[in-house]
Amino acid sequence: QYCTIFDKEMIWYSIDAFRKAKTIDDFIVVVDANEMKSGRLNKDYGVTLVQGGSTRNESFKNALDYIHEHFPDCENIIENNAACPMITPELIDEFITLLKDYDYVNTAYKITDALGSYKDRIANREDFYLIQAPDAYRFPLLYKHFDKDSELCHPAHQLPLSATEYRYFDYNDNYKVTYPDDIKIVEMMMTRRKENK
């Protein structure tokens, strides 16, 4: 999340989107122990830092606990991965608005390739979809049910089956930076988005 895209750290794009969103009051950035100790992101961007844990679930729980303690009246939250820098303020606002009618919102993608299964010889791709950040939740419901020791790696999977889900299939230019070459792809996508405005 600290590599550079168009002369800005990748994490800057998420920070900028959250800062410009109209439907949220505040946001936090979860970082590892070394980044927390240095406080660099706070100095550079003026953001509130929360120290993460040894696992993704521990880090997420630390964030939830911070929100619960410092924002006791929090109704809704949205999380993003800094490795997904294409997020926009408008998307954040749309996800938060959807929480008026749903318990949580997932960024979803249809599977277009063939799908295999370790358990069954045949897997019907129509039964599955991909999930990526961002995702949004009604905070009290998520806080009540989230367990940092769970083997489930996506927060929504810990919610009760009665929780209502909105699958957001319209975030077409989301892209997660995983490998160095992905940066070139994101820069191309950002350029195209700017040209289409």
What is the meaning of each model-derived region?
Residues 1-33:
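N-terminal glycine-rich phosphate-binding loop and ensuing alpha1 helix
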Residues 3, 85, 121, 135, ...:
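Residues that recognize and position ribonucleotide moieties
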Residues 18-19, 67, 159:
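Hydrophobic C-terminal alpha-helix "anchor/cap" residues
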Residues 34-40:
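Short, charged/polar "capping" segments at the starts of alpha-helices
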Residues 44-56:
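Conserved donor nucleotide-binding strand/loop of the catalytic core
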Residues 49-51, 125-129:
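Short pre-catalytic strand/loop immediately N-terminal to key active-site residues, enriched for Gly-Thr
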Residues 55-118, 132:
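Conserved beta-loop-beta/alpha segment of the NTase-like Rossmann-fold superfamily
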Residues 130-197:
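Conserved alpha/beta core of the MobA/IspD/sugar-nucleotide pyrophosphorylase nucleotidyltransferase superfamily
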